[in-house]
UniProtKB/Swiss-Prot annotation:
GO terms for cellular component: condensed nuclear chromosome; nucleosome; nucleus. Residues 120-131 have a biased composition (Basic and acidic residues). This is Histone H1. The lineage of its organism: Eukaryota, Fungi, Dikarya, Ascomycota, Pezizomycotina. It is found in: Nucleus; Chromosome. It comes from Emericella nidulans (strain FGSC A4 / ATCC 38163 / CBS 112.46 / NRRL 194 / M139).
Length: 200
């Protein structure tokens, strides 16, 4: 006889729910109902039941799951109840994430560099001005002191040069009528004067 097959003990995996979470269903209902002041709980429940395949459950079980989903959504900031817990439900506006403050460009080092160059230029300008002041000081002549007494011994009087005596010119007329000029010999007085000067 063929052996009997062992009975399979593995149970079939239970089929999960065919609908999304209650919170997502409520979000979808509010978006589609498009009411300005929010949607009432009754209208949201009707939309959820009509558009989702829910497992058969009692009305009390559905209401408890529905209320829990709204409460959790309010705590997480998904829903708003402006008129209290029994009032209409609205979707909370998501705040845009705060933009990080723009980083300041690192210009401190760049701005510091021109200052250094400016100080260097100023130092160079000061150095360039200093020689000018020295030159001006050098250019100013010191006041002349008292003239030094001439201590040098008086030089001997230079020997007088012999006096040049103009030789008198004698004009004579020849027989033919021509004029001739001849220098006369110096007189004895002139020769004596020159002799005295030489002795002195």
């Amino acid at each position: 006889m063929p052996p009997k097959k062992a009975p399979t003990t593995a149970k079939k995996a239970a089929s999960g729910p065919t609908h999304t979470s209650y919170r997502d269903m409520i979000k979808d209902a509010i978006l589609n109902l498009k009411e300005r002041n929010g949607s009432s709980r009754q209208s949201i429940k009707k939309y959820v039941l009509a558009n989702n395949k829910l497992a058969p459950a009692s009305q009390n079980a559905f209401d408890s799951q529905f209320n829990k989903a709204i409460k959790a959504g309010v705590e997480k900031g998904d829903f708003i109840q402006p008129k209290g817990t029994s009032g209409p439900v609205k979707l909370a506006k998501k705040q845009a994430p705060a933009k990080p403050a723009p980083k300041k460009p690192a210009t401190t080092t760049k701005t510091a560099a021109p200052k250094k160059t400016a100080t260097k230029k100023a130092d160079k300008a000061e150095k360039a001005e200093k020689p000018k002041t020295k030159k001006t000081n050098a250019g100013v002549k010191k006041p002349a002191g008292r003239p030094k007494a001439n201590t040098a011994k008086p030089r001997k009087a230079s020997t007088a040069a012999p006096a040049v005596v103009d030789k008198p010119k004698v004009v004579s007329v020849t027989k033919s009528g021509r004029k001739t000029t001849t220098t006369a010999k110096p007189t004895e007085k002139a020769t004596k004067k020159t002799a005295k000067n030489k002795k002195a």
